[in-house]
């Protein structure tokens, strides 16, 4: 998905209200490209991840239709501290990934929740647990501790500010 950054200089001069972090899912393809999709959970089969996503989407549609869909959003975090060793920052498919600071612009739907609910649902592998975790996830329940996940729809609302340098 490509974002058009027509007035880049003007944009950089504007006051930035809130910075979020976004990470590519592999080698960077273009200066303004944002990718979106499902999260990775180590040691889970593709079938487990796919079925969990289906259940989470079913629960969202049934009980939380105002929330952004995990299937059509960009995933962000407010800060990178605590994400080291977690799915946002480190799994084999992201060894070549880069992290970027982004700003949200325009009309968008933002939802903050605890990413651990999704991870636990995948790891347990049964539909009853997945439904229970999905409800907690979409309620935004629990403490975020280190796993605050931010979903933003549409993905085009996340505009790259600059590459994050450690």
Which positions does each model-derived feature cover?
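Short acidic, low-complexity intrinsically disordered linear motifs used
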Residues: 1-15
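Charged/polar, solvent-exposed surface patches and flexible loops
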Residues: 10, 54-61, 85-88, 136
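Short aromatic-glycine-(Arg/Gly/Cys) micro-motifs in beta-strand/loop hairpins
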Residues: 43-68
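Conserved NAD+-utilizing ADP-ribose enzyme module
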Residues: 17-18, 25-49, 70-72, 81-166
């Amino acid at each position: 998905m490509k974002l058009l950054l027509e007035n880049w200089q003007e944009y950089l001069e504007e006051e930035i209200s809130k910075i979020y972090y976004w990470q590519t899912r592999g080698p960077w393809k273009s200066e303004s490209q944002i990718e979106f999709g499902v999260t990775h959970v180590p040691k889970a089969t593709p079938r487990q991840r796919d079925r969990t996503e289906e259940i989470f989407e079913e629960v969202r549609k049934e009980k939380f239709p105002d929330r952004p869909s995990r299937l059509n959003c960009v995933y962000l975090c407010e800060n990178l501290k605590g994400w080291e060793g977690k799915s946002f920052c480190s799994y084999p498919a992201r060894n070549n990934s880069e992290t970027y600071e982004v700003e949200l612009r325009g009309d968008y739907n933002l939802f903050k929740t605890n990413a651990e609910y999704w991870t636990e649902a995948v790891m347990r592998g049964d539909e009853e647990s997945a439904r229970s975790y999905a409800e907690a996830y979409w309620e935004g329940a629990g403490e975020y501790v280190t796993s605050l996940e931010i979903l933003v729809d549409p993905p085009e609302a996340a505009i790259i500010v600059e590459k994050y340098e450690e």
